């Protein structure tokens, strides 16, 4: 079966296509892909993984054409990012000129 394993940093992305036998787990596919050698900072014990954007367990069996994604940890609070991106509201009771 042909599958893909992907990982992305802000400055570098990797998409590896590999052939695996039926019954291969997510963890086995990641290990076989060699991506752990390219990105030694990946820690499968702490980082989440998914298939096509949906969380997956390391022992889940992959299917033909699957795209396994290794997710980086969140380093910024999403609420902080949203707050920074939102336009400032006028002060309560204030008037605009």
From Swiss-Prot:
InterPro entries: Mopterin_synth/thiamin_S_b, RnfH, RnfH_sf. Belongs to the UPF0125 (RnfH) family. This is Protein RnfH. It comes from Paramagnetospirillum magneticum (strain ATCC 700264 / AMB-1) (Magnetospirillum magneticum).
């Amino acid at each position: 079966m042909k599958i893909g394993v992907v990982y992305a940093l802000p400055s570098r992305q990797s998409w590896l296509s590999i052939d695996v036998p039926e019954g291969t787990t997510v963890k086995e596919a990641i290990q076989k892909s060699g991506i752990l050698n390219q990105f030694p900072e990946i820690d499968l014990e702490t980082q989440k993984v998914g298939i096509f954007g949906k969380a997956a367990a390391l022992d889940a069996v992959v299917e033909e054409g699957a795209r396994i994604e290794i997710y980086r940890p969140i380093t910024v609070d999403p609420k902080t990012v949203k707050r920074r991106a939102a336009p400032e509201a006028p002060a309560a009771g204030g008037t605009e000129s």
